[in-house]
């Protein structure tokens, strides 16, 4: 676990009107919370997209022909990078606004809390966390709960199991 401040560079782009979407400062706060104590320096990009772009990316990269809530694209460390050279690029997150809004409504969650959860979830994927089996999912979900609790956000998995 690392201590001290995180040097964070988060590029945020909106591919649809910003009305009703979280501000860039919120996304940065959620990313910083997910990285706190885990990494000291990070560069990443977040793109908030519509359903058409979300579906296109999910189809192209995952072979699934529907829009999903969040996609994580971890950066590859360049081959031949000298040992000891820092490579702070974490990767990219794509968050599909209509899917997030629909899920928040269906699950009775506050919209901003759901965005926070999915941002944290996506950042953890960029850090190498996964949920391919029950044990991995349980560990990742517990970490998400802890991070979100630090942000004052309720357990997003309450009542699911």
Swiss-Prot record:
<keyword id="KW-0698">rRNA processing</keyword>
<keyword id="KW-0862">Zinc</keyword>
<dbReference type="GO" id="GO:0004521">
    <property type="term" value="F:RNA endonuclease activity"/>
</dbReference>
<dbReference type="InterPro" id="IPR002036">
    <property type="entry name" value="YbeY"/>
</dbReference>
<keyword id="KW-0690">Ribosome biogenesis</keyword>
<dbReference type="InterPro" id="IPR023091">
    <property type="entry name" value="MetalPrtase_cat_dom_sf_prd"/>
</dbReference>
<comment type="similarity">
    <text>Belongs to the endoribonuclease YbeY family.</text>
</comment>
<keyword id="KW-0255">Endonuclease</keyword>
<keyword id="KW-0378">Hydrolase</keyword>
<dbReference type="GO" id="GO:0008270">
    <property type="term" value="F:zinc ion binding"/>
</dbReference>
<dbReference type="InterPro" id="IPR020549">
    <property type="entry name" value="YbeY_CS"/>
</dbReference>
<comment type="function">
    <text>Single strand-specific metallo-endoribonuclease involved in late-stage 70S ribosome quality control and in maturation of the 3' terminus of the 16S rRNA.</text>
</comment>
<keyword id="KW-0963">Cytoplasm</keyword>
<feature type="binding site">
    <location>
        <position position="125"/>
    </location>
    <ligand>
        <name>Zn(2+)</name>
    </ligand>
</feature>
<keyword id="KW-0479">Metal-binding</keyword>
<dbReference type="Pfam" id="PF02130">
    <property type="entry name" value="YbeY"/>
</dbReference>
<feature type="binding site">
    <location>
        <position position="131"/>
    </location>
    <ligand>
        <name>Zn(2+)</name>
    </ligand>
</feature>
<keyword id="KW-0540">Nuclease</keyword>
<protein>
    <recommendedName>
        <fullName>Endoribonuclease YbeY</fullName>
        <ecNumber>3.1.-.-</ecNumber>
    </recommendedName>
</protein>
<feature type="binding site">
    <location>
        <position position="121"/>
    </location>
    <ligand>
        <name>Zn(2+)</name>
    </ligand>
</feature>
<dbReference type="GO" id="GO:0006364">
    <property type="term" value="P:rRNA processing"/>
</dbReference>
<dbReference type="GO" id="GO:0005737">
    <property type="term" value="C:cytoplasm"/>
</dbReference>
<dbReference type="GO" id="GO:0004222">
    <property type="term" value="F:metalloendopeptidase activity"/>
</dbReference>
């Amino acid at each position: 676990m690392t201590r001290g401040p995180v040097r964070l560079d988060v590029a945020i782009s909106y591919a649809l009107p910003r009305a009703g979407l979280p501000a860039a400062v919120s996304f940065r706060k959620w990313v910083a919370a997910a990285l706190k104590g885990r990494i000291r320096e990070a560069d990443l990009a977040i793109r908030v997209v519509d359903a058409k772009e979300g579906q296109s990316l999910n189809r192209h990269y995952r072979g699934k022909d529907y829009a999903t809530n969040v996609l994580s694209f971890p950066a590859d460390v360049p081959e031949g990078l000298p040992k000891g050279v820092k490579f702070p690029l974490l990767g990219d997150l794509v968050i599909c606004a209509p899917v997030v809004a629909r899920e928040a409504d269906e699950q009775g969650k506050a919209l901003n809390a759901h965005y926070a959860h999915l941002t944290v979830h996506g950042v953890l994927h960029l850090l190498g966390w996964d949920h391919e089996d029950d044990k991995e999912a349980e560990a990742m979900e517990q970490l998400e709960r802890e991070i979100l609790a630090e942000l004052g956000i309720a357990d997003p998995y309450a009542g699911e199991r």
